[in-house]
Each structure stands twice: as structure tokens, then as C-alpha cells.
Amino acid sequence: MSHRPGHEILTSVKAIVTVMPKPSVLDPQGAATAEAMKHLGLEETGRVRVGKSIEIELSGDANEDKLHEIARDLLSNPVIEDYRLEIVK
């Protein structure tokens, strides 16, 4: 069976999924963090966005497409969030 580059079947994989609010979505937690930073004396604080980072370790027949499916359908809300997938090993 041939595979496209970047879509190899992996026997064990560790990946980090970073989920962030889309730029067009209000981020009240980011705004509150920016305001708190100003109270700490960081007056020149720019825009702050708050997201989450999820580390996944899978064994068995995992592939990059499956990891994207997990990130898109389980770990993020594609209506209001973007995700980035980084395969670590």
C-alpha cells in the first residue's frame, strides 16, 4: 500500500494540538488577561489570546489524517476555533 508523503501509518505517535479562538471571535479570557497584565504594570500589553494545548500519545495504526480528524472533530470547535497539529515523534 502506498502512502502520500506526510500521511504514513505510524506505529506510535506523540502529537501536540494547539487550539486557539479564531481571530474574528471575541476572547473574553484573553481580554481579562490583558487587563490583569496592565494592573501588574505592563501598560504596553497588546492583544492577548488564550487557547489550549493538548498532548496526545497514540499507539497502533495511527496516521496524520486520523490525528487531524481527532483535532478537528473532538478537540476543537471549528466554528469558533482553529487548531494546529504538531507531530513530535
What is the predicted function of each stretch?
Residues 1-89:
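Non-catalytic terminal accessory/regulatory regions of metabolic enzymes
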